[in-house]
């Protein structure tokens, strides 16, 4: 099992946490990570860009001038793409840019990104990270304690609780910090709250230099992404 230092909000080491090799210490699959990021960026595209062809531009029903004897170049319509205010040749039309990735590839990409952070010593695990009220100064002090004052940091929290929500609100004014609450409170399975890691994504993990997780978030990630390892052992 891989190990990582367990820190408090003062930046002090309070213990060691064992983490799953299957989730946090695999050989990263960069191809699958690229596919995941490509999917994310493609799915952000609105696909609403639109231009009119010569058949859609208004006007130009008649020939602008006779074919011969004017001394001017021949033209059949003012809607031609070579005319000002004419139609557009091969212009964009509304389309769906969205892409899909199967569940196994998504999970492999997430495990690869987590492993990159662990192997580069850019994964920090805290006992917990909650604030009594939204205050940017409080979160900034915590980041200074972790020597991340001027670094780009992604903070991922497990539940949509008040203390975690306050951290998310506190991080909105910090340009180098993004806070994700990886939870979907509306999701349930058989009447029970399903364990989800919604929001955790490869693009943000690669964009930000450091990844900060809580102990509960690590357990949650291992529960979701470690399913394949458990299935292999019981097969």
Curated annotation (Swiss-Prot):
It comes from the Bacteria. Residues 45-75 are annotated as: Disordered. One of its GO terms (biological process) is translation. Residues 65-75 have a biased composition (Basic residues). InterPro entries: Ribosomal_uL4, Ribosomal_uL4-like, Ribosomal_uL4_dom_sf. One of its GO terms (cellular component) is ribonucleoprotein complex. Keywords: Ribonucleoprotein, Ribosomal protein, RNA-binding, rRNA-binding. One of its GO terms (molecular function) is rRNA binding. It holds the Pfam family Ribosomal_L4. One of the primary rRNA binding proteins, this protein initially binds near the 5'-end of the 23S rRNA. It is important during the early stages of 50S assembly. It makes multiple contacts with different domains of the 23S rRNA in the assembled 50S subunit and ribosome. Part of the 50S ribosomal subunit. HAMAP family: Ribosomal_uL4_B (MF_01328_B). Belongs to the universal ribosomal protein uL4 family. This is Large ribosomal subunit protein uL4.
């Amino acid at each position: 099992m891989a190990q990582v230092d367990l820190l408090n909000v003062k930046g002090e080491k309070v213990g060691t946490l064992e983490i799953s090799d299957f989730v946090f210490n695999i050989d990263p699959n960069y191809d699958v990570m690229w596919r995941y990021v490509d999917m994310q960026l493609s799915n952000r595209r609105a696909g609403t860009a639109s231009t009119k062809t010569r058949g859609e531009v208004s006007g130009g029903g008649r020939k602008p001038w006779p074919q011969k004897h004017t001394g001017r170049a021949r033209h059949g319509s003012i809607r031609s793409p070579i005319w000002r205010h004419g139609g557009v040749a091969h212009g964009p039309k509304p389309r769906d840019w969205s892409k899909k990735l199967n569940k196994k590839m998504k999970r492999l990409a997430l495990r690869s990104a987590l492993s990159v952070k662990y192997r580069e010593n850019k994964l920090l695990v805290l006992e917990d990270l909650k604030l009594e009220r939204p205050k940017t100064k409080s979160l900034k002090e915590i980041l200074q304690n972790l020597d991340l004052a001027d670094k780009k940091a992604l903070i991922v929290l497990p539940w949509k609780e008040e203390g975690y929500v306050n951290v998310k609100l506190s991080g909105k004014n910090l340009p180098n910090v993004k806070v994700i609450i990886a939870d979907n409170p509306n999701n349930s399975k058989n009447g029970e709250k399903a364990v989800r890691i919604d929001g955790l994504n490869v693009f943000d993990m690669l964009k930000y230099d450091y990844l900060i997780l809580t102990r509960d978030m690590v357990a949650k990630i291992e529960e979701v992404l470690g399913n394949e390892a458990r299935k292999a052992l019981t097969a």
